């Protein structure tokens, strides 16, 4: 089996496990880029029977993603094309905005800090916390907090504030 077949097989397996969890009304945790439409549609449907909680880690730019993938490949990890990374970087954030009203909770983290190999990696920074439609962080009335939101996350934070119940 070549790498493309292995990736397709792994994706199909993960999707079927998510579908089974939704059908069985059981808990399920998984990782996704949220870059396509299939998982977004499944999560939208799941929100009718489940509390969908999402921890979303984002980066400042597709170029930072590309650099991290190159580092991963250099250490034996799998490759993703630059074109695919750029497509997913935009699509993922748009899909998240569409899903916002369906999520029971969203915690959005900025994971853009880069460190030299061998150095401690700092924790991602919480940028947005929304629970039951209420924005807990950032405080939209605090100019410093709003200015601290990284540019890549601003459309998501703005959408959450527009849709906020409080």
Positions of the model-derived regions?
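A structural signal for short, well-ordered beta-strand segments and their strand-loop junctions
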Residues: 29-31, 54, 106-110
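Conserved nucleotide-binding/hydrolysis micro-motifs of P-loop NTPases
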Residues: 35, 58-64, 113-115
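Conserved nucleotide-sensing/catalytic segment adjacent to the nucleotide-binding pocket
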Residues: 1-47, 51, 83
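Short glycine-/polar-rich loops that comprise or flank the Walker A/P-loop
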Residues: 25, 48-53, 76, 102-105
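A broadly conserved amphipathic alpha-helix scaffold signal in soluble, globular proteins
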Residues: 44, 90, 97, 101-104
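A glycine- and Lys/Arg-enriched "phosphate-lid" helix/loop adjacent to the NTP-binding pocket
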Residues: 50-96
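Short, glycine/charged-enriched secondary-structure capping and boundary segments
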Residues: 43-46, 68-71, 122-123
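NTP-dependent small-molecule kinase module
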Residues: 100-166
């Amino acid at each position: 089996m070549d790498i493309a077949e292995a990736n397709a097989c792994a994706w199909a397996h993960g999707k079927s496990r998510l579908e089974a969890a939704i059908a069985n009304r059981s808990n399920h945790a998984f990782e996704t880029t949220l870059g396509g439409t299939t998982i977004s549609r499944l999560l939208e449907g799941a929100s009718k029977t489940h509390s969908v909680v999402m921890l979303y880690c984002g980066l400042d730019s597709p170029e930072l993603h590309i650099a991290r993938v190159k580092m991963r490949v250099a250490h034996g990890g799998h490759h993703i094309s630059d074109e695919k990374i750029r497509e997913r970087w935009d699509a993922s954030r748009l899909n998240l905005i569409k899903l916002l009203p369906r999520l029971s909770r969203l915690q959005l983290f900025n994971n853009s800090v880069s460190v030299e190999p061998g150095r401690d990696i700092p924790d991602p920074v919480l940028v947005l916390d929304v629970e039951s439609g209420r924005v807990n962080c950032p405080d939209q009335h605090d100019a410093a907090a709003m200015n601290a939101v990284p540019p890549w996350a601003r459309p998501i934070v703005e959408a959450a504030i527009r849709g906020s119940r409080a």
